Amino acid sequence: MDMNMKQNKIYGFLQKWIPVLILLLYPLRKVNTGIDLMDGGYSLGNYRFFTTMNQVWKLATYLANVLGAALSRLPFGNTWIGMNVYTALLTGITAAGAYCVLRKRLQHPVLIWLGEMLALSLCWAPPTNLYQYLGYYLMTAAVLVLYHALTNKNNICYIIAGIILGLAVGVRMPNITYAALILPVWYYAWLTKDRDWFIHTLYCIGGYVLGLLVPLGVIVFKYGVQAYPEMIASLFGMTDTATDYKPTSMIMAMFGDYIQYS
């Protein structure tokens, strides 16, 4: 009987944690494959020369550059494979963390795990591109916190979710679109006939503003009041000389080959 109980405990432990371990390590499968001379190298160059890089691009993806510069100071952070490992582990931690949270709250954990594996398999950009991935990590965290806030009526979590989404704007300005996550709050309030929806909205907005002010405050303190507006103006001005930065060009770049060769 004792042997069976011990075997059941071991089986339960493996059943619980092996899927988590796979999600954690799966992004490492290609860390030693090839050399990327495009976005991967561009991002690593920004981290390595963060203190002397062009201010426009430093501020355009500020929090991503700060995190990348910090990772590059870790052991082997001055090597390509070392940075691949560190940044890929961030992806794995995010996926494993999301799975651990969702399997406790949703049915069919196997389907959740398969969905996480599919999402990891579709990550096309190099993991060192933190200006993309850090925004994804923050959005994932915000969604999980917001889900907890909605299902448990936790006002603090509304604020925390807002803070996380505000920080995401410091990663890259287009992440301001993540503010659309207020729509599920309103939809859930409509479904549950929640009369406190307006207060919850204010909690979210307050947290969002607070999260937004943190990176902006650091930028203003270090680079001056005009630094961020000048960066925005410079980025918008690039569409005059670099047509591939226009929104229409970016959209056509995604679908151009399909249209051309279909």
Question: Which residues does each PLM region occupy?
Answer:
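Membrane-interface transmembrane helices that cradle and orient dolichyl/undecaprenyl
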Residues: R103-L106, A142-Y158, R195
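Membrane-interface alpha helices of multi-pass inner-membrane proteins
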Residues: C123, V145, C157-N175, A179-P184, ...
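Short acidic/glycine- and proline-prone juxtamembrane loop motifs at membrane-interface regions
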Residues: P127-Y136
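Perimembrane helix-loop-helix junctions
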Residues: V145, T151, T177-L212, G217, ...
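Membrane-lumen/periplasm interface segments of specific transmembrane helices
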Residues: T201-S262
